[in-house]
Curated annotation (Swiss-Prot):
Cofactor requirements of the protein: Fe(2+); L-ascorbate
Residues the record lists as binding 2-oxoglutarate: R165
Keyword vocabulary terms for this entry: Dioxygenase, Iron, Metal-binding, Oxidoreductase, Vitamin C
Pfam families per the UniProt record, alphabetical: 2OG-FeII_Oxy_3
Enzyme class: oxidoreductase
Protein name, UniProt field: PKHD-type hydroxylase PMN2A_0775
Residue ranges annotated for the Fe2OG dioxygenase domain, each copy included: 80-174
Any single GO BP term: DNA damage response
Residues annotated for Fe cation binding in this entry: H98, D100, H155
Source organism per UniProt: Prochlorococcus marinus (strain NATL2A)
Cofactor details (free text): Binds 1 Fe(2+) ion per subunit.
Amino acid sequence: MEYLTHSLIAKSEARQIVNKLKAEKLSWQDGKKTAGSHASEKKSNFQLDKNSKLSIKLRDIIVNKIISNPLLKSFTLPSLIHGVMFTQSLAGHHYGSHIDNPYMPSGRSDLSFTLFLNAPEDYEGGELCIQTINKTEKIKLSAGEMIIYPSTQLHSVAEVKDGERHVCVGWIQSYVQNNEDRNFLFGLDAGAKGLLAKHGRSDELDLIFQAYSNILRRLGD
């Protein structure tokens, strides 16, 4: 499984978002409302109403941060970032093993992301657990850091034992649906840009960029 962790926002900005979320008293809903039929009984958390003014404002900030980041754009090749929501998990809350719906009302889920908004020492437990063939990856990042991983993977959120866990989650519909194809293009793009930075433009490098663009045309939606 290929996944990417990256610092999306500063810790100070993440702290400001958490403070705004804590000040919002009336717009929190039971997280079961947005879970698929197979996952609703496994889910316990609170989610900010997607239609609230605060949710819309914060969602736009996060989406703009993602699409303006060259590394994230290269890794995800996003055609649509959708379903973005803010969640709060208190002591006893968890989300059992599940897989994200392939098609949601807002779009197709090729990649999933979790942006951690508060510091790992603020809560005990609450790790994002991504299952692979041989092991389970347990992810708990610093405030402002995010993980992007294939939506094809089974995953869960460990029970929060103490404190509060605040995250932003969402999904990415990519121009290239297949994970292996997307990872191949990411490596090709990273290598070409590295050569450009180290050696400057050349006719040979132009051929690599041409190949990348034409492969993307062939593989893309």
